[in-house]
Amino acid sequence: MGVNAVHWFRKGLRLHDNPALKECIQGADTIRCVYILDPWFAGSSNVGINRWRFLLQCLEDLDANLRKLNSRLLVIRGQPADVFPRLFKEWNITKLSIEYDSEPFGKERDAAIKKLATEAGVEVIVRISHTLYDLDKIIELNGGQPPLTYKRFQTLISKMEPLEIPVETITSEVIEKCTTPLSDDHDEKYGVPSLEELGFDTDGLSSAVWPGGETEALTRLERHLERRAWVANFERPRMNANSLLASPTGLSPYLRFGCLSCRLFYFKLTDLYKKVKKNSSPPLSLYGQLLWREFFYTAATNNPRFDKMEGNPICVQIPWDKNPEALAKWAEGRTGFPWIDAIMTQLRQEGWIHHLARHAVACFLTGSDLWISWEEGMKVFEELLLDADWSINAGSWMWLSCSSFFQQFFHCYCPVGFGRRTDPNGDYIRRYLPVLRGFPAKYIYDPWNAPEGIQKVAKCLIGVNYPKPMVNHAEASRLNIERMKQIYQQLSRYRGLGLLASVPSNPNGNGGLMGYTPGENIPNCSSSGSCSQGSGILHYAHGDSQQAHLLKQGSSSMGHGLSNGKRPSQEEDTQSIGPKVQRQSTN
């Protein structure tokens, strides 16, 4: 009997830098590449049509690239635990390869499949390629706990072995004599389904702004690297109106689905930097979003409650309000704040928004204006974002709601001033909220302040054609910052730089604007919500070592006062980061 191999695609939807697939092919007589699609999951999961379309395009592109190698992708309907025992027998499988999945659900699923494979006498190959590092080694290096500050994470990875370079792309030379048995009815049995087959109504669906697939990902990577000046000077692009629109060099959805290898991206950046900088070593900051991605993956890998507040040992237990009506207005872009509504409209239409736009709407939903749980916002992003990733999505929402990783709760974005500073003319608003197109720039961010005559000329009456603001931002943010301050004052084991003592008694005294970037002057929101230029921002730079040492489960456990406010020593900073609590049972 020959060696019959199966590679199971989940993420990692690519032929470049795919070590599990490459090893599976070696020594095999036949290779079948499968993707398992659960039809029930397609109809019931919290995933919107844009992300499903992106996934199906990824699968179509993967199938097209496999065809060039005289192979095909086999899309199989069912659940893995039901599908594999049948395939092992039907195809006489002797070898199965998978990319390592670091998320708790994925680890549990893969453990079950490995058990079934072992019982069937099938060898299982598991290789890491969705992350840069072996996350378990990072945790081991940190004494068995995930690092909960980015500074500590950077310290740990600086001690790791150098990254392995990407493996060679799967080509006809790599496959050699390894063949894929194909049937005449392949497309009927194993073809990539359409959105309609999955039950989606595609009437009115606009063309994809982000085409899925490895081919597109590699094209975008080359465009991204053409920005040699950015790499040479390592300047973060300045935020402007064009930044808010989808870029032909954007990569985040491709990294999320594994159409693009994070290692390939890392080494391409490194090589280009060394060419431009004449072989000098690149700073860690060059890899920005790649390392934040690793940070959140590491924090989440052993925490199945990472996407929940309750039972999550690293999450502050905040008594958020339940307000389904307000949540719906936020999610559907009906808040009455054009900046917020334009962002949520772009998200729903295209499946992507700029990272600072994500910050703005997350702040508005949680600690700044609506006081609604980050879990609710996370679910909306999970549905609508192309690049929604369990670990990163949950981690980002905990961070932006000051529930973990970051506790500078007296920062919030003005839903008028931040947009006006970014795009003074309001072109972004006009693009996604055409109902407001007729307003002059002076009023487009706060149209409720426009005189009635201007509203009539714009053919948009506030409260009739476009909603009035759902909250008074200045008042809501002042009250919510005070609520957050009181919660943090109750945390029994907070260790920082006397952070709470430095919060002004009226942190919103400048009218509702809390700054995000130190050293800038940005528009000030008045109590009416209008903006005026020139107010300074409040910014307290407390360094990474203030990660709160989070507490027992539930608000009832909040304890007995603050720390002494002294800065931790450098030794404490590097050795004592992370929660000192036992994980609660999830039963």
UniProtKB/Swiss-Prot annotation:
Residue interval(s) of motif LIR 12: 486-491
Motif (LIR 8): 379-384
Residue ranges of the motif LIR 7: 335-339
UniProt similarity note: Belongs to the DNA photolyase class-1 family.
Motif (LIR 2): 82-87
Record InterPro entries: Crypto/Photolyase_FAD-like_sf (IPR036134), Crypto/Photolyase_N_sf (IPR036155), Cryptochr/Photolyase_FAD-bd (IPR005101), Cryptochrome/DNA_photolyase_1 (IPR002081), DNA_photolyase_N (IPR006050), Rossmann-like_a/b/a_fold (IPR014729)
Keyword Cytoplasm: yes
Species name: Spalax judaei (Judean Mountains blind mole rat)
Span list, region Disordered: 554-587
GO MF entry, a single one: photoreceptor activity
Motif (LIR 5): 271-276
Sequence motif LIR 10, residues: 411-416
Motif LIR 13 mapped to chain: 492-497
Function: Transcriptional repressor which forms a core component of the circadian clock. The circadian clock, an internal time-keeping system, regulates various physiological processes through the generation of approximately 24 hour circadian rhythms in gene expression, which are translated into rhythms in metabolism and behavior. It is derived from the Latin roots 'circa' (about) and 'diem' (day) and acts as an important regulator of a wide array of physiological functions including metabolism, sleep, body temperature, blood pressure, endocrine, immune, cardiovascular, and renal function.
Protein name: Cryptochrome-1
UniProt PTM comment: Phosphorylation on Ser-247 by MAPK is important for the inhibition of CLOCK-BMAL1-mediated transcriptional activity. Phosphorylation by CSNK1E requires interaction with PER1 or PER2. Phosphorylation at Ser-71 and Ser-280 by AMPK decreases protein stability. Phosphorylation at Ser-569 exhibits a robust circadian rhythm with a peak at CT8, increases protein stability, prevents SCF(FBXL3)-mediated degradation and is antagonized by interaction with PRKDC. Ubiquitinated by the SCF(FBXL3) and SCF(FBXL21) complexes, regulating the balance between degradation and stabilization. The SCF(FBXL3) complex is mainly nuclear and mediates ubiquitination and subsequent degradation of CRY1. In contrast, cytoplasmic SCF(FBXL21) complex-mediated ubiquitination leads to stabilize CRY1 and counteract the activity of the SCF(FBXL3) complex. The SCF(FBXL3) and SCF(FBXL21) complexes probably mediate ubiquitination at different Lys residues.
Motif residue range(s): LIR 1: 50-54
Sequence motif LIR 11, residues: 430-435
Cofactor note: Binds 1 FAD per subunit. Only a minority of the protein molecules contain bound FAD. Contrary to the situation in photolyases, the FAD is bound in a shallow, surface-exposed pocket. Binds 1 5,10-methenyltetrahydrofolate (MTHF) non-covalently per subunit.
Subunit structure: Component of the circadian core oscillator, which includes the CRY proteins, CLOCK or NPAS2, BMAL1 or BMAL2, CSNK1D and/or CSNK1E, TIMELESS, and the PER proteins. Interacts directly with TIMELESS. Interacts directly with PER1, PER2 and PER3; interaction with PER2 inhibits its ubiquitination and vice versa. Interacts with FBXL21. Interacts with FBXL3. Interacts with CLOCK-BMAL1 independently of PER2 and DNA. Interacts with HDAC1, HDAC2 and SIN3B. Interacts with nuclear receptors AR, NR1D1, NR3C1/GR, RORA and RORC; the interaction with at least NR3C1/GR is ligand dependent.
Residue span of motif LIR 4: 255-260
